[in-house]
């Protein structure tokens, strides 16, 4: 319940054995402290119920599969190419973290803050991102196929990302705290693959979906206000009760096969190619 309310309201050198060493920074700020797996586990154990401070640590390339991060502070952490399949990152703060190419398949990212995080080319297949803040994050080329996404992705870059069969649809039976849905307002999904994705009630207002694959996607009740769907494939997509106010379908394929177009809101204000 706490997570639901929070989202509703939010809008290197090799380490020396046994010693923490300073790794070369990836950004022009505080150098990161390189940790090996035993050192990381020691820090997590030392927290003893508190919030582990792993900010500015370098964990790049480590095998962290299944590890419980205990709601750690991982701001500006380096986790590029880390193997984190099935890891528990519940309620962690990964603001400005670097997770380029990381394997986060089936990881628990519920309640996690990933604001401005670098997740380009990351594997998030089957991951859970419920009540997750992913604002302005870099997810270019990331794989979120089959992931559960009820999060805040305003201004995120998902160009070329894979979201095939992703479940980003609102749960009609779990709205006691207000509308809980995936928010892609102003996000860049150019060329993204959302084939068969559940996008029920998702908010794509002002988002760029140019050349995106939306075949058989469920966009019922979705907000597509001023969304750019130029040259997108919308074959078989469900749009009944979706808000199409000034949505641009110019050059889109499969428009004639949209399901429920006659029931869409503001259909007359949408932009379609002339017959």
Mark where each language-model region is.
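Boundary at the C-terminal end of the N-terminal hydrophobic targeting segment
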Residues: 11, 16-19, 23
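Bacterial N-terminal signal peptides
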Residues: 1-12
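Tandem repeat scaffolds
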Residues: 20-275
């Amino acid at each position: 319940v706490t997570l639901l309310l929070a989202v509703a309201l939010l809008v290197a050198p090799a380490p020396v054995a046994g010693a923490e060493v300073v790794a070369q920074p990836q950004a022009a700020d505080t150098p990161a402290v390189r940790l090996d797996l035993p050192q990381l586990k020691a820090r997590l154990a030392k927290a003893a119920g508190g919030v582990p401070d792993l900010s500015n640590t370098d964990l790049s390339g480590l095998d962290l599969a299944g590890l419980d991060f205990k709601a750690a502070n991982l701001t500006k952490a380096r986790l590029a190419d880390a193997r984190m399949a099935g890891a528990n990152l519940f309620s962690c703060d990964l603001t400005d973290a670097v997770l380029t190419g990381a394997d986060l398949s089936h990881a628990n990212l519920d309640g996690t803050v990933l604001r401005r995080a670098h997740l380009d080319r990351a594997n998030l297949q089957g991951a859970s991102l419920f009540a997750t803040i992913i604002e302005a994050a870099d997810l270019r080329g990331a794989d979120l196929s089959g992931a559960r996404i009820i999060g805040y992705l305003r201004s995120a870059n998902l160009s070329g990302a894979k979201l095939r069969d992703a479940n980003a649809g609102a749960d009609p039976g779990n709205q006691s705290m207000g509308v809980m849905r995936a928010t892609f307002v102003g996000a860049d999904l150019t060329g993204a693959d959302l084939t068969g994705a559940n996008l029920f009630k998702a908010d794509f207002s002002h988002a760029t979906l140019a050349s995106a694959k939306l075949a058989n996607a469920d966009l019922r009740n979705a907000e597509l206000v001023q969304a750019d769907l130029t040259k997108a494939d919308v074959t078989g997509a469900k749009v009944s009760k979706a808000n199409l106010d000034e949505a641009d379908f110019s050059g889109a394929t499969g428009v004639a096969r949209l399901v429920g177009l006659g029931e869409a809101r503001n259909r007359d204000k949408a932009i379609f190619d002339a017959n």
